[in-house]
Amino acid sequence: MKKLLKLFSFVLVAAMCIAMCSCAKTGLRSKPVDLEHVMPLLMYVGCGDDSGKASQPAFTDEELQQLTDAGINEYVLLTTFMPTYYCDIDENGNAVGEPQRLCTKEDIYTLTAEDLGLESDSEFDLTNAQEKIIRDSYVTPADNKSTINQQIDYEIELAKRILAINPNAKFWFSLPHTKIIEGATFYAEHYMDVIYPKVKIAFSEEEFEKNVGGLYWSTEDAGGNAFDVENQVDFGNPAVKAAKYCSDILHEDNKTLMWIPYTSAGRQYERIGFISNLTDVFDYVYMQPGYLWHAEKEPYVGYIKSSVEAGAVLNSNGAIYGGEKKSSTVIGVEIELDRKVISGKEAEAHMTRYNAYVENFSQFKSDKLIAIYCSNSNDMFVETVTELLFQWYK
């Protein structure tokens, strides 16, 4: 009997070890989650460049009231800002010390051949690749050294203004675009040391629980050479590694990471599929058709429609990338809208393409599998554009 018990114990421990090793080799949560569906409006706020100034046009209180009256409760606060600097923060979220680089030359020289997706292991090739990144991407912006601290302050300010009007609003704050994609993990570490703590500090415990949905990953692609489909933790890709670092922290607080990637032929669309179907790095993935501005992207309307219907990213033949949907990721579509549908030489063509969105994607309104892009406040509150926007929330 004792021998049988020992044998059973051995088998049980071995099975647990195998299970743990198996889990360790995926980018999935420890168990599936059923995520709330949300239908966010994207709102530009704050910095549009390295000046540190709020170059995006501000929303008026009257405009924020109109958004609330239209039934809009979820917002992504975003920026076109591609930052270079950050400042450390104190316990109150205030910047301390001088601005520092998010990714330094020293950081770049720590990147390995595997990080860079190099086939060669030679030191010569690695050094050349590192120095090419520095030449191509390591730029020095204006002397004012605007920081991620300034941008998140603008986002928090707008969120508080919306909350004063709509106490049920929920927000996703931006993790700005990574200027040096190969060094994305360095950006991510500083983002989660500065941006996320500042959000936590800015809101009461009750507000953080109720009104903060999470963060928005602004880098719209999974660039870089490295992408190993056999590595279903992060594919060895710098952008996915960085995003996973952020989402792991968010998931500990029951918060989510949102991604709205652009679609294009070739590896970008394929990568969206593998990331979305096989990992829980991103909790919400709303794919951009791009058709509103690019007539040649019409096929993506059909691809995305089929994917949202299936709840998994499908290839052009209708097959699931990765073979099956393993993740809890919510798959949706971004509706693109701006004043080009009513003004300019190609307004009629833009409106025709916009109507294709209405025809193909309106079915997803009731399940809230839609995010809405409507440019900045200057475009959003042009009369006809506003009416078209609000139709999605009726």
Regions found by a protein language model. Name each.
Residues 10-19:
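Bacterial N-terminal signal peptides
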Residues 129-151, 215-223, 231-235, 288-293, ...:
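The substrate-binding groove and active-site-proximal loops of carbohydrate-active enzymes
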Residues 18-29:
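Sec-dependent signal peptide cleavage junction
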Residues 1-11:
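Bacterial N-terminal signal peptides that target proteins for export
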Residues 28-190:
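N-terminal catalytic cores of secreted or lumenal carbohydrate-active enzymes
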Residues 72-74, 78-79, 83-84, 210-213, ...:
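Substrate-binding cleft of secreted/luminal carbohydrate-active enzymes
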Residues 167-193, 212, 216-217, 246-270, ...:
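Aromatic-lined carbohydrate-recognition surfaces of secreted/lumenal glycan-active proteins
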Residues 191-195, 211, 222-242, 247, ...:
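Extracellular glycoside hydrolase catalytic/binding regions
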